[in-house]
């Protein structure tokens, strides 16, 4: 039995609240159970110097956690003068995931930054951030479209992410902290709405996992991402 008493293929309750920030062109408060992430999309009519003159835009992300998002206070990275390797890894993952489904030429020579701030952490912060960031990005692009800044909304399809792992010998979907901290294997899957794989991150914490176990995790992830994509679609219609 999972600590949360969920079925092995059952996700936590997921919700999206759009338009939560007054000034951002797009924003979303996403909740995966007790993991809450606030995402703000910011449009800038400028590009990184290395991208100027290439006729395409850019989508990037930044990620951080509030000091009391965790059980014990975590120092703000700004006070240390540098970002941790984990933070850099996660924000690059978010950016890659969103760019994989964005028509950067259709965006034009502009940049959209997704700021992902973890308000409360209970496992799966990066997967929640990616999934909520897609909603915020969609709303930012729709904001531009409504103002005739775009001819069409340059999103190819949905993208979402979910964690899976092996907990007490059993593959399970959407790990919370209690499961993630004791899992023999944990993995993150980023997939598109049509089933394309953007990225897989998997680690054996105790003993190596088999190919069959990997395929079991992949099957769980496909189910979870499919459900998340449907929730995204419902959210943007609301």
From Swiss-Prot:
Organism: Azorhizobium caulinodans (strain ATCC 43989 / DSM 5975 / JCM 20966 / LMG 6465 / NBRC 14845 / NCIMB 13405 / ORS 571)
UniProt catalytic activity: tRNA(n+1) + phosphate = tRNA(n) + a ribonucleoside 5'-diphosphate
Pfam families, alphabetized: RNase_PH (PF01138), RNase_PH_C (PF03725)
Subunit relationships: Homohexameric ring arranged as a trimer of dimers.
One of the GO BP terms on file: rRNA catabolic process
E.C. no: 2.7.7.56
Entry function: Phosphorolytic 3'-5' exoribonuclease that plays an important role in tRNA 3'-end maturation. Removes nucleotide residues following the 3'-CCA terminus of tRNAs; can also add nucleotides to the ends of RNA molecules by using nucleoside diphosphates as substrates, but this may not be physiologically important. Probably plays a role in initiation of 16S rRNA degradation (leading to ribosome degradation) during starvation.
Enzyme class, UniProt record, top EC level: transferase
Chain positions recorded as phosphate binding sites: 86, 124-126
Keywords: Nucleotidyltransferase, RNA-binding, rRNA processing, Transferase, tRNA processing, tRNA-binding
Family: Belongs to the RNase PH family.
Gene Ontology molecular function terms on file: 3'-5'-RNA exonuclease activity; tRNA binding; tRNA nucleotidyltransferase activity
InterPro entries linked: ExoRNase_PH_dom1, ExoRNase_PH_dom2, ExoRNase_PH_dom2_sf, PNPase/RNase_PH_dom_sf, Ribosomal_Su5_D2-typ_SF, RNase_PH, RNase_PH_bac-type, RNase_PH_CS
CDD domains membership: RNase_PH_bact
UniProt keyword Nucleotidyltransferase present: yes
Protein name: Ribonuclease PH
Transmembrane domains' residue ranges: none
């Amino acid at each position: 039995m999972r600590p949360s008493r969920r079925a092995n293929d059952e996700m936590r309750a997921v919700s999206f609240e759009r338009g939560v920030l007054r000034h951002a062109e797009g924003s979303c408060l996403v909740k995966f159970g007790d993991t809450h992430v606030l995402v703000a999309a910011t449009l800038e009519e400028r590009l990184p110097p290395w991208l100027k003159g290439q006729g395409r835009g850019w989508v990037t992300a930044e990620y951080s956690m509030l000091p009391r998002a965790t059980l014990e206070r975590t120092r703000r990275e700004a006070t240390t003068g540098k970002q941790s390797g984990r933070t850099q890894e996660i924000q690059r993952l978010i950016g890659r995931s969103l760019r994989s489904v964005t028509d950067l030429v259709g965006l034009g020579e502009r940049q959209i930054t997704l700021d992902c701030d973890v308000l409360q952490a209970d496992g799966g912060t990066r997967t929640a951030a990616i999934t909520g960031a897609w909603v915020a990005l969609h709303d930012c692009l729709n904001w531009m479209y409504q103002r005739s800044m775009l001819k069409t909304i340059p999103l190819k399809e949905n993208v979402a992410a979910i964690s899976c792992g092996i907990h007490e010998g059993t593959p399970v979907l959407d790990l919370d902290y209690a499961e993630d901290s004791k899992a023999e294997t944990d993995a993150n899957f980023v997939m598109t709405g049509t089933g394309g794989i953007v990225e897989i991150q998997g680690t054996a914490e105790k003993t190596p996992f088999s190919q069959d176990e990997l395929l079991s995790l992949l099957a769980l992830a496909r189910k979870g991402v499919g459900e998340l994509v449907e929730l995204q679609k419902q959210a943007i219609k609301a």
